[in-house]
Curated annotation (Swiss-Prot):
The gene is glpK. Sn-glycerol 3-phosphate binds at residues 12, 82-83, 134, 244. ATP binds at residues 12-14, 266, 309, 313, 410. InterPro entries: ATPase_NBD, Carb_kinase_FGGY, Carb_kinase_FGGY_CS, FGGY_C, FGGY_N, Glycerol_kin. It holds the Pfam family FGGY_C. This is Glycerol kinase. Belongs to the FGGY kinase family. One of its GO terms (biological process) is glycerol-3-phosphate metabolic process. The phosphoenolpyruvate-dependent sugar phosphotransferase system (PTS), including enzyme I, and histidine-containing protein (HPr) are required for the phosphorylation, which leads to the activation of the enzyme. It comes from Staphylococcus aureus (strain MSSA476).
């Protein structure tokens, strides 16, 4: 009887369940979207119960649609949108407020106040993160400060906090397991990534009671079992957890120090495995935990690109220059270059290494001869220039020259982007056969814990290359193009509307 690992990929707009066999191949997929709530400008929220319902639905669907029995599931892995915060009543199981999503800016004033009080470096040193509304800690504080009676309940031990992984494990296990893993804990602003413990000083600054917090566990371990009424009478081990970007790093088999993956999603996320050393960044990168396994943790440097694949969506939906995302490739290849045109897609500011929230998108180098093809090519080249910005920051901070770049996300299907990426970073770009690397990473972590796979070496054999793109551009051309990009970014940062 063939066995499978069931991977739950709980994302920002949808929940997915994917079955993987022992070769790491996909045996079934189910997906369900859920509602986004925008109560005020800049606020983004989810209903945690709707997320839970969507997860139950896709788990049921993927099993039923693929004629798999529940007793064929060897283990469950969970990967999740990171930082999104749920606070719930531990007796009723009901959230006391919507889940506050990672994108939400409603805690900006809390961050600003802590910065004014001089605590930014304290948080940076202990957590590797910036004092930003992006991370979970200020979201918990906001809920406790703004929901009537919440703080009193929390202090009495009646409330629990969790990121989405914690919420799902608690529900799946029938309220038995209140846990998170090292990778998710490292995104909360409350976890000391050096001591590997919740930090009392940070909790005091955020006024968050410690009794709300989940137990922090390795990313690959049996945390509990599904309660039988959720899983066709079966008690299936819940055995692997990692935040989405860390799961993608693991799914790309980036197990060695210096291994790098880049995800081209709506935004872009690059992670470098820095081994057992937490590298302090001088270049605006985040220092974070990659995963905890085999009794130790691996650290990572992370760079964020705010606009990646969404630049192609903008060409399609905003400017209506293309009818579909794949069409961007055919337009881009109709011309030999952009003829000096640069698009800086700073629609919501610039991420790593600039961290300029006030910058806005700009276009440079237009002439009477500029055509649609040049504009489209310049827009999709911007994904690759931004990736080089982050990669150079990583090499500078870590002292490691990147030997190859493993890639995933929607834009990797575009061969033009992949080749231009290899050219502009002067490094081989490796596109895997299975591009569902986030879900695969969670499956690998769960599979290791239940003996479905024996070791990381066993897993590495399952990673298969679909295509390798080697750099073909000469050095002079590469540096000339990149100098132009740096000038364009500089000009973008100078131009600020009032």
């Amino acid at each position: 009887m063939e066995k499978y690992i069931l991977s739950i990929d709980q994302g920002t707009t949808s929940s997915r369940a994917i079955l993987f066999n022992q070769k790491g191949e996909i045996a079934g997929v189910a997906q369900r979207e859920f509602k986004q709530y925008f109560p005020q400008s800049g606020w983004v929220e989810h209903d945690a119960n709707e997320i839970w319902t969507s997860v139950l639905a896709v788990m049921t669907e993927v099993i039923n649609e693929n004629d798999v029995r529940a007793d064929q599931i060897a283990g469950i892995g969970i990967t999740n949108q990171r930082e999104t915060t749920v606070v719930w009543d531990k007796h009723t199981g009901r959230p006391i407020y919507h889940a506050i999503v990672w994108q939400s800016r409603q805690t900006q004033s809390i961050c600003s106040e802590l910065k004014q009080q001089g605590y930014e470096q304290t948080f940076r040193d202990k957590t590797g993160l910036l004092l930003d509304p992006y991370f979970a800690g200020t979201k918990v504080k906001w809920i406790l400060d703004n929901v009537e009676g919440a703080r009193e309940k929390a202090e009495n031990g009646d409330l629990l906090f969790g990121t989405i992984d914690t919420w799902l494990v608690w529900k799946l296990s029938g309220k038995a397991a209140h846990i998170t893993d090292y990778s998710n804990a490292s995104r909360t602003l409350m976890f000391n990534i050096h001591d590997l413990e919740w930090d009392d000083e940070l909790l005091e600054l955020l006024t968050v009671p410690k009794n709300m917090l989940p137990e922090v566990k390795p990313s690959s371990e049996v945390y509990g079992k599904t309660i039988d009424y959720h899983f066709y009478g079966q008690e299936v081990p819940i055995a692997g957890v990692a935040g989405d970007q860390q799961a993608a790093l693991f799914g790309q088999a980036c197990f060695e120090r210096g291994d790098v993956k880049n995800t081209y999603g709506t935004g872009g996320f690059m992670l470098m495995n820095t081994g057992d050393k937490a590298v302090k960044s001088e270049s605006g990168l985040l220092t974070t935990i990659a995963y905890g396994i085999d009794g130790k943790v691996n650290y990572a440097l992370e760079g964020s690109i705010f606009v990646s694949g969404s630049a192609i969506q903008w060409l399609r939906d905003g400017l209506r220059m293309i009818n579909s995302a794949p069409q961007s490739e055919s337009y881009a290849t109709r011309v030999d270059s952009t003829e000096g045109v640069y698009v800086v897609p700073a629609f919501v500011g610039l991420g790593t290494p600039y961290w300029d929230s006030e910058a806005r998108g700009a276009i440079f180098g237009l002439s009477r001869g500029t055509e649609k093809e040049h504009f489209i090519r310049a827009t999709i080249e911007s994904l690759c220039y931004q990736t080089r910005d982050v990669m150079e920051a990583m090499s500078k901070d870590s002292g490691i020259d990147v030997q190859s770049l493993r890639v995933d996300g929607g834009a990797v299907k575009n061969n033009f982007i992949m080749q231009f990426q290899a050219d502009i970073v002067n490094t081989s770009v490796e596109r895997p056969e299975i591009q569902e690397t986030t879900a695969l990473g969670a499956a690998f972590l769960a599979g290791l814990a239940v003996g479905f796979w024996e070791s990381k070496d066993d897993i590495a054999k399952n990673w298969k290359l679909e295509e390798k793109f080697d750099p073909k551009m000469d050095e002079g051309e590469r540096e000339k193009l990149y100098r132009g990009w740096k000038k364009a970014v500089e000009a973008t940062q100078v131009f600020k509307t009032e």
